Amino acid sequence: MDFMKPETVLDLGNIRDALVRMEDTIIFNFIERSQFYASPSVYKVNQFPIPNFDGSFLDWLLSQHERIHSQVRRYDAPDEVPFFPNVLEKTFLPKINYPSVLASYADEINVNKEILKIYTSEIVPGIAAGSGEQEDNLGSCAMADIECLQSLSRRIHFGRFVAEAKFISEGDKIVDLIKKRDVEGIEALITNAEVEKRILDRLLEKGRAYGTDPTLKFTQHIQSKVKPEVIVKIYKDFVIPLTKKVEVDYLLRRLEDEEDDDATQKSGGYVDRFLSSGLY
């Protein structure tokens, strides 16, 4: 997928490849995080005295991480959504003028606050090595958290591209649902239970196959792994529902933008095949 070439962004094969790679990244990031205990102090607001900052240790580290990455254009990319947009800085590198693919308000579709809350309260307890503190590894723990959060965010916000493809392909049907503000109807239109089952089945097999990552970055804890059933539950209960929320939120506002002159061209065969696949 090349964001400088809009015709590749909604291509069925490219979409599928991107989603599969994201699954791999998320699973291996979970394996990295599973080396460490839950360490709830990392997520407790003002647990540590950080100068000129009000928030948790993870909030601070993640915001600093995003601030630095913004200087090298990470958040100029259409598929990256920051957790702390207020800390982003201008890049010193030449600006990249990405062609428009999404609606003008796409950057406003941001569920990262929900992702962060669910991650710290629901996901970490399921993948951590234990429920207690691990004071000697707080920094490594938080760094692993950041990789998990950013990979989850990219996967979930990819729903904006899915939604745009469905809007173009469905035409009057989806326009009518948007005009009626029919959230249930839109949800039904974007849901494909058969494809969802295939995703979960694939994740179960990947979880069994991957087991332990032999290239753990922070330590070499050979017992570190995440139960395949936990990975499936995370996708079923959180990743897929949040992706659908992103799609619905995007579609409900889609009529704010006037249709592009090239809408007919963009609704070619590859979008029809994408929709029939039910990928999200």
Curated annotation (Swiss-Prot):
It comes from Pichia angusta (Yeast). Signal peptide: none annotated. L-tyrosine binds at residues 73-74, 137, 139-140. GO terms for cellular component: cytoplasm. This is Chorismate mutase. Its EC number is 5.4.99.5. Optimum temperature is 48 degrees Celsius. Transmembrane segments: none annotated. It is an enzyme of class 5 (isomerase). L-tryptophan binds at residues 137, 139-140. Keywords: Allosteric enzyme, Amino-acid biosynthesis, Aromatic amino acid biosynthesis, Cytoplasm, Isomerase, Phenylalanine biosynthesis, Tyrosine biosynthesis. GO terms for biological process: chorismate metabolic process; L-phenylalanine biosynthetic process; tyrosine biosynthetic process. Homodimer. InterPro entries: Chorismate_II_sf, Chorismate_mutase_AroQ_euk, CM_AroQ_sf_eucaryotic, CM_II_prokaryot. Each dimer has two allosteric binding sites that can bind the regulatory effectors tryptophan or tyrosine. Can bind either one tryptophan or one tyrosine, two tryptophan or two tyrosine or one tryptophan and one tyrosine, which differentially affect the catalytic activity. Activated by tryptophan and subject to feedback inhibition by tyrosine. In the presence of both tryptophan and tyrosine, the enzyme is in the activated state. Catalyzes the Claisen rearrangement of chorismate to prephenate. Acts at the first branch point in the aromatic amino acid pathway where it steers biosynthesis towards phenylalanine and tyrosine, and away from tryptophan. It catalyses: chorismate = prephenate. It comes from the Eukaryota. Residues 3-256 form the Chorismate mutase domain. Induction: Induced by growth on methanol carbon source. Slightly induced by growth on the non-fermentable carbon source glycerol. Not induced by histidine starvation. SUPFAM superfamilies: Chorismate mutase II. GO terms for molecular function: chorismate mutase activity. It is found in: Cytoplasm. Its main location: cytoplasm. The gene is ARO7.
